[in-house]
Amino acid sequence: MNYKGIIFDFNGTLFWDTAFHDLAFDIFLEKHGVQLSDDEKRVKIHGQTNPDIMRGIFGDQITEKEILDFSQDKEAIYRQLCINDLKFASGAEDLFDFLHDKGIPFTIATSAGIENVSFYFENMNLNRWFRLDKIVYNNGTFDGKPNPDVFLAAALKLNLPPQETVIFEDSIPGIEAAESAGAGKIYIVNSYGENYSRFPYQIITNFNEVDRKLFA
């Protein structure tokens, strides 16, 4: 089957920044006297929106103002950590150029908020391939992964049914969200050594491994 569009997760997929996020959370949580194991981070943090993360860590009693303040604090730490190491995953830019030359639409669906998305646009030249108004990011109007809303919204941005799209993801909740969205094909991007044995999808570590014939 030939697919008509691509949806990329961003963090841990196009930008391998999981270690930066984990370190930022370590620094943030230490300030608040909280410790999480690596397994707890995978469950409570990876692939989640900041409001869901903060509720998972601090409980439902956390206020909306605390969620906002804590999230901004953590993301400021994260941006400071990764500012000097902003680069796309291997082969990603080649794939962008291929898709652009073929006229195949593609976009990003991310749990990141607008502050980080703007940071990526400014420092990674995302506007070479992407338009901000075509990207789906966490604006507080949809639930985090594994809820499929972010991918369904991205498919709408592409004006395609999800079944005609290929979704690239790295996190377990993200893969589950792609499944629930009804993606035509799913690629797993193994950026941090996760165990994906439960899933039947091709696992890649370089975007040059993507079969271009899928879009012929």
Regions inferred by a protein language model and the residue ranges of each:
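Residue-level marker of alpha-helix boundaries and capping positions
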Residues: 16, 86, 108, 142, ...
